[in-house]
Amino acid sequence: MASSSGSSPRPAPDENEFPFGCPPTVCQDPKEPRALCCAGCLSENPRNGEDQICPKCRGEDLQSISPGSRLRTQEKAHPEVAEAGIGCPFAGVGCSFKGSPQSVQEHEVTSQTSHLNLLLGFMKQWKARLGCGLESGPMALEQNLSDLQLQAAVEVAGDLEVDCYRAPCSESQEELALQHFMKEKLLAELEGKLRVFENIVAVLNKEVEASHLALATSIHQSQLDRERILSLEQRVVELQQTLAQKDQALGKLEQSLRLMEEASFDGTFLWKITNVTRRCHESACGRTVSLFSPAFYTAKYGYKLCLRLYLNGDGTGKRTHLSLFIVIMRGEYDALLPWPFRNKVTFMLLDQNNREHAIDAFRPDLSSASFQRPQSETNVASGCPLFFPLSKLQSPKHAYVKDDTMFLKCIVETST
């Protein structure tokens, strides 16, 4: 192109007059103050009416040259354009290669593995973002999908805006066809990426639905398990209460059986007392003041009685004598018996050498409340507070206590 004439500087082209890759001053010295791009080589060409071909390309038949060949023609006609370099088609996923169109084509062939790795990393990043949405729940996942669709639309709109910004002001049909081809290619790539993302989101949605179903099932089963556990715990408490009641009843039954085995039904009762030394010490210390014997009866359906022994004495015999009393107990057949109780009572401390038993007897005081029909479990004990001196209990002449054991006998007169 001819060098610029005149002293007025050539203004920069309008921003819509240069396509991408068209340097602003490839062809110098335009004849007009305004310039546009050569339809053949994308180089700057002076605006001179209908002449849209720069002098370097005017010798070529541009109508018969394909877009790819036209680029090679541009490289030959304007090597400075090729030296400027173009980016790799995979720059959007991280490839930083730039060069001439031929070197870019060779780069695409030789760098397929690295491009696949870049695409893989790109997809992993999107998958991670989608995974975050999955962990946050379906609402967050739908929001991520909307964001992706919006971002893809923005990218498409941005690319279209850039293309429009860089669209050549030439009205050449070939250039318009090339631009349309590039736009369609970019749109196809973005649509392909969007379809991939939509497929990924669809799969993740299915997984989310399956997870929600499994979670709902698990929650329902957990609720059933909790209700079952509560029911079993309540049942265990009931069984424990029942078991405690049965243990108590069994204890009473065993005690009753033992008492029945030890009881007599003829008015005569023999009471064996073991650990006499320890029991005397406990009585003297006030720890165990008195001892009760098992119950016995004057007959099978007669009076129910028991003995009460104070090893350290009671009343007038405290600390000096054994005090022995009889206790009228409430029986099952009291309503059929004559009251007050009037049978003679005889106490005996047995000499285990059978030499000299200690004996004391008395007849009931019919006016005493101790011998009236019992209104509680037991009446007040009555008997002999000075039954036997403590000083003679360990006498070597007698065996009232032998092997730390002594025997007391009670005889209730049954004939009236």
Curated annotation (Swiss-Prot):
Cross-referenced CDD domains: MATH_TRAF1
Location of the region described as Disordered in the Swiss-Prot/TrEMBL record: 1-24
Keywords: Apoptosis, Coiled coil, Isopeptide bond, Phosphoprotein, Ubl conjugation
GO annotation, cellular component aspect: cytoplasm; cytosol
Effect recorded for K185R: Nearly abolished ubiquitination
SMART domains: MATH
UniProt GO BP: apoptotic process; positive regulation of NF-kappaB transcription factor activity; protein-containing complex assembly; regulation of canonical NF-kappaB signal transduction; regulation of extrinsic apoptotic signaling pathway; tumor necrosis factor-mediated signaling pathway
Gene3D superfamilies: 1.20.5.110, Apoptosis, Tumor Necrosis Factor Receptor Associated Protein 2, Chain A (2.60.210.10)
PTM characteristics: Polyubiquitinated by BIRC2 and/or BIRC3, leading to its subsequent proteasomal degradation. Ubiquitinated by the SCF(FBXL2) complex, leading to its degradation by the proteasome.
Domain notes: The coiled coil domain mediates homo- and hetero-oligomerization.
Protein name: TNF receptor-associated factor 1
